[in-house]
C-alpha cells in the first residue's frame, strides 16, 4: 500500500459500510455505487475486511473479507460489510435493532507476499506480531488472521496454533511441515 487513505476516504468507507448494512438488514436493495462520486484511491481495486464488534463488550459479531483485490475498494467494503452482517457462519444474521449497538472496523489489505523459509521451527521468528497478517495454506485448506489478532494471541507459536485450528488442522501442524505462508499488512480504521 503505497498511498494511504485520507481521513475523508476513511469516513466515506465507514458511511458506505454502515448504510449497506442498514439497507441489507431492512431487506432493501443495496445501493449501486456510482464510482465517479468517489476519490481515485477508492475507485482502485482493493482488498478489505469488514469487522463488526458489539459496542457493549467489544465482542466480535461478524468479520468477512477478501485477501486479494478484485474490485474497486469502495465496492469491496460495501460487499463485505453486508457479508459480515448477514453471512458470517459463526453468528446469526445481524438484525435491524442491533445495528446501533455495533461498531464497524475496516481493514484495507496490502498485497500478500509469500514468506520463504526452510525450517518450520524458524517460522515464528519470521512473523512480526502486531504488524503482519498471516495466511496459511496446506493443499486446499486455507486460513488467515488479520494483524489485529495479535492483540489476543501475542505469542507467535500460539498465534500459529490457533491459525492451524482455524484452517481445520492440528494446532501443531505448522511444526510438522513447510506450509505455504504469506504475510500482509493492513491500514485499519473504525468508527
Question: Language-model features: where?
Answer:
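Basic nucleic-acid-binding interfaces
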Residues: 1-191
Amino acid at each position: 500500500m503505497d498511498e494511504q487513505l485520507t481521513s475523508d476516504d476513511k469516513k466515506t468507507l465507514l458511511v458506505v459500510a454502515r448504510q449497506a448494512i442498514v439497507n441489507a438488514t431492512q431487506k432493501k436493495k443495496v445501493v449501486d455505487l456510482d464510482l465517479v462520486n468517489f476519490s481515485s484511491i477508492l475507485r482502485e481495486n482493493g482488498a478489505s475486511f469488514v469487522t463488526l464488534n458489539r459496542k457493549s463488550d467489544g465482542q466480535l459479531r461478524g468479520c468477512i473479507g477478501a485477501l486479494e483485490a478484485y474490485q474497486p475498494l469502495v465496492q469491496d467494503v460495501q460487499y463485505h460489510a453486508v457479508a459480515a452482517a448477514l453471512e458470517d457462519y459463526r453468528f446469526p444474521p445481524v438484525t435491524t435493532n442491533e445495528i446501533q449497538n455495533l461498531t464497524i472496523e475496516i481493514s484495507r489489505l496490502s498485497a500478500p507476499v509469500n514468506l520463504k523459509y526452510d525450517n518450520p521451527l524458524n517460522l515464528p521468528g519470521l512473523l512480526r506480531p502486531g504488524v503482519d497478517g498471516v495466511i496459511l495454506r496446506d493443499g486446499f485448506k486455507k486460513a488467515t488472521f488479520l494483524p489485529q489478532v495479535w492483540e489476543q494471541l501475542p505469542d507467535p507459536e500460539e498465534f500459529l496454533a490457533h491459525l492451524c485450528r482455524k484452517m481445520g488442522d492440528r494446532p501443531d501442524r505448522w511444526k510438522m511441515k513447510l506450509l505455504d505462508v504469506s504475510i500482509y499488512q493492513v491500514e485499519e480504521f473504525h468508527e
